[in-house]
């Protein structure tokens, strides 16, 4: 493709030839022919080398707010120079360039390589793709430009942030008959001996090891291993109303952080965790444990988006047969625009489940994007409580 400079040169050459013919000026005609010949010869010798592009990422999976280090290796595989080569690596607009540049002008000799390094900040969770790579070749006199794309994509998943969860002895009221081959070597309520520790005020006297007290003269407590794996169910509200607020602060974002933190805590305890997301449809991930289940949960949370208006009662009715008897249930929802929440919670409690509702206040998030009078805000908070 010709540049503006080449177009003006070609047009000027044609004009000089025509004007020279009209006024019988051979010198002007020769000058016009020189311009045309210059364009033709330049087009004949122009071109570019065979360029190979490789991209390396510091990680394929990151947490929200982390930095992604990107390195782009550009190699000239041909036997000619690339002349003026512009390289631009396309990045998602949700990511911010923290340091370095994702574009560079190069002039590579045959077999020569160059590296482009830059750092991206990942402020939003989701599934993203870095690429493709845009290449623009300019010849020596900047008369022609060739543009092309290298279809090289690098997929990356940004997980929600993980917050610390305080220790909580949450367990199923009904022990599982078959817990598999997982050995639970962590302290908690149970029957199998784990270790001895010093007495702390508030410990039950029935757990005091009197033989150790007679031998050492200090009160020692018998720590027990947790008896069985607990099936834990997390229900996340992803309805359209969960988008209230800003992009970074809204009920859905807070809900994904809470769900990811709970899943991390209980999977580290070697419990089985299930995730249910409801919006316009119902997505159910059966309970399981281990790193594979943890990755499935984080991947599901990374791709969740607000849509739909499914009520909670429909969710609990559909999943009632899949819930293990007496298992804890966490409901993460703003509870706005859904009058079935109280009846759904009562049904779960009636079936013997220990229900915990985590409800981010949509009123506080709405106040970030709209002007709510102070008095109205206080009234809405009282009504919500």
Locations of regions flagged by a protein language model:
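Von Willebrand factor type A / integrin I
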Residues: 1-49, 311, 323-328, 335-385
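Short, flexible loop segments at the rims of nucleotide/cofactor-binding pockets, characterized by
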Residues: 211, 305-309, 333
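Short low-complexity, flexible loop/linker segments enriched in glycine and/or proline
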Residues: 289-292, 371-373
């Amino acid at each position: 493709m010709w540049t503006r400079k080449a177009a003006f040169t070609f047009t000027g050459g044609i004009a000089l030839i025509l004007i020279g013919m009209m006024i019988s000026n051979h010198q002007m005609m020769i000058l016009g022919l020189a311009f045309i010949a210059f364009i033709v010869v330049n087009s004949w010798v122009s071109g570019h080398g065979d360029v190979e592009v490789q991209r390396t990422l510091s990680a394929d999976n990151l947490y929200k707010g982390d930095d992604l280090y990107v390195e782009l290796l550009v190699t000239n595989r041909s036997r000619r120079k690339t002349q003026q080569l512009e390289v631009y690596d396309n990045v998602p607009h949700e990511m911010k360039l923290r340091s370095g540049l994702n574009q560079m002008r190069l002039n590579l000799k045959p077999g020569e390589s160059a590296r482009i390094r830059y750092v991206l900040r990942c402020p939003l969770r989701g599934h993203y793709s870095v690429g493709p790579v845009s290449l623009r070749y300019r010849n020596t006199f900047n008369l022609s430009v060739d543009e092309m794309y290298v279809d090289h994509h690098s997929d990356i998943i940004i997980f929600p942030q993980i917050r610390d969860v305080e220790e909580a002895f949450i367990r199923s009221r009904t022990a599982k008959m078959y817990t598999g081959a997982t050995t639970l070597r962590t302290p908690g309520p149970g029957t199998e001996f784990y270790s001895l520790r010093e007495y702390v005020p508030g410990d039950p006297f029935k757990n005091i090891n009197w033989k150790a007290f007679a031998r050492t003269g200090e009160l020692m407590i018998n720590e027990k291993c947790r008896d069985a794996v607990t099936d834990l169910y997390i229900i996340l509200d992803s309805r359209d109303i969960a988008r209230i607020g800003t992009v970074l602060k809204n009920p859905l974002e807070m809900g994904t952080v809470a769900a990811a933190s709970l899943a991390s805590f209980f999977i580290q305890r070697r419990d089985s965790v299930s995730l249910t997301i409801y919006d316009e449809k119902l997505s159910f991930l059966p309970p399981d444990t281990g790193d594979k289940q943890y990755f499935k949960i984080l991947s599901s949370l990374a791709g969740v988006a607000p849509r739909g208006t499914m009520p909670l009662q429909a969710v609990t009715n559909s999943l009632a047969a899949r819930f293990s008897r007496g298992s804890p249930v966490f409901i993460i929802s703003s509870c706005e625009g859904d009058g079935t929440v109280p009846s759904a919670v009562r049904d779960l409690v009636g079936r013997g489940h220990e229900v915990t509702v985590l409800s981010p206040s949509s009123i506080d998030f709405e106040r970030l994007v709209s002007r709510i009078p102070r008095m109205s805000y206080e009234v809405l908070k009282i009504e919500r409580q």
